[in-house]
């Protein structure tokens, strides 16, 4: 009836509790409904005509008071004198005279039914209702509200993850760090023989969407071992102590399935630092302590590897990160340009692409995008192709998908007045022209005044020619000038300002503040850090590390940076007013201008800039080709190393098989020799027996001859 003995135990316990509650309820109910009175009180009530009816039932008399009695609404009972052998023939007469209804019942006929109705049926009902409730709670709470020690980990069999390193792109360094773990799980013997121990745990750290969970599954897929997957929040649910019990159960199962991988996603849910704060969570700390104990207790040579993922490594407890636990930290950061292109290739493997599609251009247009973003872009492009009735995805679909992710869908039904449209056009061209005429800015890719659903009335898209990991002070100032170029154009052309620059002002202010408070680009504060960035992988807000007075001075410095950048933008646009008007006219006519067309207009006035830009492009392309060649060389080296490891493993396996075969043959030969010797011994023994038997027969024959000759002699005499 019950597959889970623990569940049966809990239902029995709760049934006993329910029985006690039911017993108490029945006792209280009897106390409330029934009241015992003396027989003399009953007689007095009868004389006062305060009795409505009487029922003689076994050893007691049940009395129902009349409406005039003070005890109205209760059922009274008193002892029946007949039980003691005392008869009162006058009682029946008095009841008849008083007009009181009376009746005689046999209680034994109703005892069984009363017992069933009062006790058995309610208990059965409670039992089955409780069973159904616990069953539903089990299903809803992933293993059960009553399964205290059971973990909720999803167990993937050896080939069920379906993911290998081929499905992970743009994270070559992370994959390289994990190849060692895969090799260890493939063949733990060679590590044990040399005395090497693999790290017990590896912590995957990086922003959301970079592929930390995918990497963990790829490790399991490559190693072809069982894969336990569990979220940190799954350890703690509603009962104190459940988290620690689940940790114990998880590691117990892992040791039984070894070699295997245990993956804990979002481990910061249980691994937060125990800082002694008053608002500490005892249940979470118990779970963390149990996890630390288990990681100390198991032997990594058995082949159990713990992988965990988080995007908040700064909040993790130091004991969790010390050597012997999660002592290897693998950074899974945002992919670079080549990485983004490789990711796009992976996600577009099953998508029909046109021959003219350039994934490199899409990779260039998505700086800072993670794997999840790029997968979404490819899917959006495929959906757009289907929407337009095409059988394959073209470049336009991918370009539009990028813009949908960045700015939202086109909002063609939003009609702007001619004046507003003109303001938006000058605003966007102001951004683009300042970007084109400054030296430390990214090239303009597109200018549009088509409104978008995310609120933009138009936008200017800039795409970097190369990946930048360092930004100079001059570059940051020029970037701020570009941000303020739209407002500057409004001032130069219309001599007024609008609300359209709100987002530009916000971003410019944040960049200027970072220059002063974080990057040490202020002459007044030199290299003093006034703010610190928290949660770097989650785009956390800066935390101020200075006094109110210093913060006020820093605000003045920020204002000066913004003012200088603003003045630079205004100066550029005033000097190039004719170019500003010309490009704006083209934009108003076409609504969208691509970067090449825009730059051709600019090159018409500044031909020397064309040569400089082309030279810079060639240098960047050369560097990119070198980087790509190095990456391919590195990938080939890793591939060869893995193939060599597999070859050696195969050779070792064949040698082991050959050795086992030789040993088996030697054992068989030994057994054969033993059998031959045994057969020879048996044959020799048989020959000896035959010789003995022959000698015995010969002796018997001689005796017969002697007896015969003796008899002949006797007869002759």
From Swiss-Prot:
List of residues binding Zn(2+): 427, 431, 504
Entry keyword annotation includes Membrane: yes
Side Cytoplasmic, residues: 1-7, 131-717
Annotated membrane topology: Multi-pass membrane protein
A Pfam cross-reference name: AAA
Matching NCBIfam families: FtsH_fam
Self-association state and partner proteins as the record states: Homohexamer.
Protein name: ATP-dependent zinc metalloprotease FtsH
Gene: ftsH
